[in-house]
UniProtKB/Swiss-Prot annotation:
Entry annotated with the keyword Phosphoprotein: yes
UniProt keyword GTP-binding present: no
Residue numbers binding Mn(2+) 2: E80, D108
GO biological process per UniProt: cap snatching; DNA-templated transcription; symbiont-mediated suppression of host gene expression; symbiont-mediated suppression of host mRNA transcription via inhibition of RNA polymerase II activity; viral RNA genome replication; viral translational frameshifting
Entry similarity comment: Belongs to the influenza viruses PA family.
Protein name: Polymerase acidic protein
Record's subcellular location: Host cytoplasm; Host nucleus
């Protein structure tokens, strides 16, 4: 169709049609039927006006040959085909000089003989249907409507056809020829069926009374009325305007808008250096759970009781020793801390009544691990105003780290299914309205796809740990409280299960401000040997604490059980967000919902059921070096959820900066893909802003690597 349009129509008409489509963000190469329709409409408008003049006596005459002596005025003013600003300027000028009523929409022509605006319609459907649509849209007695069809029919307001028979016959013959040409190339059926009802972007709402006065008062300086401002905005050419403004600013400022082409962007530079290390507040794929099914013990639901019950399920404890030391820490202190936990748990079991909470003895190893008395003394600023060389203490620049494969493995693992159910469907009342029914249906489908997902386990684990830590921080500010890391789930068969991942010991927690830090030591069970990826565990001291019997294809095998110990810290604001990690479910559900909405608007019906139940369809999940990865709708749900969860687990200023700055580049690339011919200035500065966020954070480095894959495939 595109080739046909370029052969069939005058190049000037083709160029005008392309410009009009680009103005509304449409691509002539994709929306070829619309391209053909716009060209046809333009040609009819030009043919309507051709050869019609008004002579010196004010009579309408037809002159087909150029007579240089004739002082003739064109009978019709052509409005269609001009850019919007110019078109409205012409309309305003006509209204001012002739006293004609200003139309709400841009008409196509103005007839100086009959003194009226004309709206031309070209339809592939019944002329009377199209005429009614036009009349309904325009709602104006003053604008004359004239409709032509490809079958030779026409219809005009009050059967007043404006032009002589011969001029109209020329237009009808041309339309019939276009139809024949299309049909001979097999294009007519698609073109005929593609016509939609009357649509408009050009509606001009009349603002009157108080709103009008408020509008006139709230204009930027130098604009006297709303109309002037509208005309200015309609004709605003951003590129030249920005260059002009910048050139006024300063001689040093030099911003030339450069075209952004497929060859323009380069990959984002990732830093070199030692591989990045794990920095989450708790273990993810490497975590090991000690679990009890159908818990019914005394005090079930009290964390300490649950923890002791879980600990009793394991019989392979052995004398612990360090297998991977922490480079900068005093490793014997980590070892002693674990031994102290075991001993104090044993003490509890020997008591007659197990207490609800356990405060650890303030031993030297725990004081060291929790940074007790390590904080520099705070001095009131007023007391040191007179000190001449007062300055903030020096802090080292963070060391650059390179991307490591473990973070991609962590993400892949987070997208996988586990054999447990981590979220229950909340009991919500009966649906009342149809929209509630659709919402419930979407929520149920989505929940079914993500309830077994490992990312959902991380959410529940994060919510539990942060809630417990914040509670303890407020309730036992001076105590080194022992906090079990617990989660609850259901097995496939629906049996309840309580899991213990390890323990946290919190330090002193007089948290006045949101950002005040509480230190804690985490001790987490794992079957992962830290010596396989020592760089991942840089911040940990790892002990071997037991041997676990595991069922495998060859029978029972014994595997060493490790304890990952590290000092960490968090704040009230971080714990508050950690407690709200369930929001990740909502965020990813909304992303899925927007995909369903897009599909539904195309099909003009709710597509929720088809969307989730059509298992054969695949959807884009993300970019990898291999290209665009695709998967089932369930995989899409779980991937979006995992991204949201990792944004929460690995939240950092580096991530905030990278997300904000890389988004700008992403928008420019998408504009290029949509053929919007974007321009940029100081692209180097944007790359600098993106790359200064790539320091050492594993999740940010992985996102940057994904962004590079996207660039590669988007610009092919």
């Amino acid at each position: 169709m595109e080739d046909f349009v370029r052969q069939c129509f005058n190049p000037m008409i083709v160029e005008l049609a392309e410009k009009a489509m680009k103005e509304y963000g449409e691509d002539p190469k994709i929306e070829t039927n619309k391209f053909a329709a716009i060209c046809t409409h333009l040609e009819v408008c030009f043919m309507y006006s051709d050869f019609h003049f008004i002579n010196e006596q004010g009579e309408s005459i037809i002159v087909e040959l150029d007579d240089p002596n004739a002082l003739l005025k064109h009978r019709f003013e052509i409005i269609e085909g001009r850019d919007r600003t110019m078109a409205w300027t012409v309309v305003n000028s006509i209204c001012n000089t002739t006293g004609a009523e200003k139309p709400k929409f841009l008409p196509d022509l103005y007839d100086y003989k009959e003194n009226r605006f004309i709206e031309i319609g070209v339809t592939r459907r019944e002329v009377h249907i199209y005429y009614l649509e036009k009349a309904n849209k325009i709602k104006s007695e003053k604008t004359h409507i004239h409709i032509f069809s490809f079958t030779g029919e026409e219809m005009a307001t009050k059967a007043d056809y404006t032009l002589d028979e011969e001029s109209r016959a020329r237009i009808k013959t041309r339309l019939f020829t276009i139809r024949q040409e299309m049909a001979s190339r097999g294009l007519w059926d698609s073109f005929r069926q593609s016509e939609r009802g009357e649509e408009t972007i050009e509606e001009r709402f009349e603002i009157t009374g108080t709103m009008r006065r408020l509008a006139d008062q709230s204009l930027p300086p130098n604009f006297s009325c709303l109309e002037n401002f509208r005309a200015y905005v309609d004709g605003f050419e951003p590129n030249g305007y920005i260059e002009g403004k910048l050139s006024q600013m300063s001689k040093e400022v030099n911003a030339k808008i450069e075209p952004f082409l497929k060859t323009t962007p380069r990959p984002i530079r990732l830093p070199d250096g030692p591989p990045c290390s794990q920095r989450s507040k708790f273990l993810l794929m490497d975590a090991l759970k000690l679990s009890i099914e159908d818990p019914s013990h005394e005090g079930e639901g009290i964390p300490l009781y649950d923890a002791i019950k879980c600990m009793r399920t394991f019989f392979g404890w052995k004398e612990p020793y360090v297998v991977k030391p922490h480079e900068k820490g005093i490793n014997p202190n980590y070892l002693l801390s674990w031994k102290q936990v075991l001993a104090e748990l044993q003490d509890i079991e020997n008591e007659e009544k197990i207490p609800r909470t356990k405060n650890m003895k303030k031993t030297s190893q725990l004081k060291w691990a929790l940074g007790e008395n390590m904080a520099p003394e705070k001095v009131d600023f007023d007391d040191c105003r007179d000190i001449g060389d007062l300055k903030q203490y020096d802090s080292d620049e963070p060391e650059l780290r390179s991307l490591s494969s473990w973070i991609q493995n962590e993400f892949n693992k987070a997208c996988e299914l586990t054999d447990s159910i981590w979220i229950e469907l909340d009991e919500i009342g009966e649906d009342v309205a149809p929209i509630e029914h659709i919402a419930s249906m979407r929520r149920n489908y989505f929940t079914a796809e993500v309830s077994h997902c490992r990312a959902t386990e991380y959410i529940m684990k994060g919510v539990y740990i942060n809630t417990a830590l914040l509670n303890a921080s407020c309730a036992a500010m001076d105590d080194f409280q022992l906090i079990p890391m617990i989660s609850k789930c259901r097995t496939k068969e629906g049996r309840r299960k309580t899991n213990l991942y390890g323990f946290i010991i919190k330090g002193r927690s007089h948290l006045r401000n949101d950002t005040d830090v509480v230190n804690f030591v985490s001790m987490e069970f794992s079957l992962t040997d830290p010596r396989l990826e020592p760089h991942k565990w840089e911040k940990y001291c790892v002990l071997e604490i037991g041997d676990m019997l595991l069922r495998s294809a060859i029978g029972q095998v014994s595997r060493p059980m490790f304890l990952y110990v590290r000092t960490n810290g968090t704040s009230k604001i971080k714990m508050k967000w950690g407690m709200e990690m369930r929001r990740c479910l909502l965020q990813s559900l909304q992303q899925i919902e927007s995909m369903i909405e897009a599909e539904s608007s195309v099909k003009e019906k709710d597509m929720t059921k088809e969307f989730f139940e059509n298992k054969s369809e695949t959807w884009p999940i993300g970019e990898s070096p291999k290209g665009v990865e695709e998967g089932s709708i369930g995989k899409v749900c779980r991937t979006l959820l995992a991204k949201s969860v990792f944004n929460s687990l690995y939240a950092s200023p580096q991530l905030e900066g990278f997300s904000a700055e890389s988004r700008k580049l992403l928008l420019v690339v998408q504009a290029l893909r949509d053929n919007l011919e974007p321009g940029t200035f100081d692209l180097g500065g944007l790359y600098e802003a993106i790359e200064e966020c790539l320091i050492n954070d594993p999740w940010v480095l992985l996102n940057a690597s994904w962004f590079n894959s996207f660039l590669t495939h988007a610009l092919r």
